[in-house]
């Protein structure tokens, strides 16, 4: 049995090579509280991130696995991009997004990981975070970045 066949056996969907992007605003509850913002409505930061995630998915033919919300604003998201070979322009785009988020006084942590992905939306948060080895690894890396203060882009290809 080939390695990716073994991975397929652990997933509801076949796995293909690609890139997973996991992003999360840092200490955002504090940001919202300090500024007296409504946590259930879009604000300048979550609106910016919503637009950025939508543009990323469109530009790179990615699939938003989890987290995109026009109604509340996007605070976190998981995007999978099947068969993406060159991540340089993706990383440059994510650096621009990070700078825009910083311009509002917030910060964001981002993981870009080349691995085997499903390229399918998740039914719930648990599936989004843990359905595949790549998602589990990306979430673990994101938590490590955030524990160390956040505000970074980690790229593993």
Predicted regions and their residues:
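Regulatory and interdomain segments flanking nucleotide-handling catalytic cores
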Residues: 1-157
């Amino acid at each position: 049995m080939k390695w990716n066949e073994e991975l397929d056996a652990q997933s509801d969907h076949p796995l293909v090579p690609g890139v997973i992007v996991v992003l999360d605003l840092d200490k955002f509850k504090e940001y919202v509280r300090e500024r007296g913002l409504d946590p259930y409505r879009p604000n300048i930061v979550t609106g910016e991130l919503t637009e950025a995630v939508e543009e990323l998915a469109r530009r790179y033919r990615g699939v938003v696995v989890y987290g995109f919300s026009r109604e509340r604003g996007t605070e976190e998201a998981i995007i999978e991009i099947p068969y993406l070979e060159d991540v340089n322009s993706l990383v440059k785009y994510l650096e621009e997004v990070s700078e825009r988020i910083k311009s509002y006084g917030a910060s964001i942590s981002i993981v870009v990981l080349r691995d085997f992905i499903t390229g399918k939306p998740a039914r719930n948060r648990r599936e989004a975070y843990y359905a595949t080895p790549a998602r589990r690894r990306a979430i673990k890396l994101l938590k490590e970045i955030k524990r160390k203060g956040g505000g970074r882009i980690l790229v593993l290809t």
